[in-house]
């Protein structure tokens, strides 16, 4: 596990269209607001990848990657099993750009609360566990919840 994210950091959340990156970024921004952490899902790197996909133009990559180096952490939202070819290509280009520039990233999988918990763990912030409810004791001999049969 990585060290806890320092206050004032910037986290980028990247992913193909429809991957849930924007939804995760919003949830993280709310969760990390008290730490004064900025969460971005609309980054120069994502724009550079989009331009490469549409026009085959990689001219924005160097500047985008240099800007991205200032981010404390990059979370890449993993694709689900039913991703289309365009999403797979976007994901592959994002991974290649980050890896090629030597920028570390964590791939985040899951849905909803599970995805948020996985992202928090990747940032070195454990998601609080849901409170456990202990089933009330119900004695089948006397129906008294505090009887000696409980022992």
In which residue ranges do the predicted regions lie?
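Post-Walker A helix-loop "phosphate-sensing" segment adjacent to the P-loop in P-loop NTPases
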Residues: 30-38
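Extreme N-terminal, non-catalytic leader segments
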Residues: 1-12
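Conserved beta-strand segments of alpha/beta enzyme cores
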Residues: 38, 104-106
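C-terminal accessory "lid"/substrate-recognition subdomains
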Residues: 2, 106, 113, 120-151
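Glycine-rich phosphate-binding P-loop
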Residues: 11-30
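Hydrophobic/aromatic beta-strand patches that form the interior of the parallel beta-sheet core
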Residues: 11, 73-75, 106-108
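ATP-dependent NMP and nucleoside kinases share a basic, alpha-helical "lid"
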Residues: 42-101
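A short acidic, often aromatic-flanked loop/helix-cap motif at beta-alpha or helix-coil junctions
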Residues: 45-48, 111-117
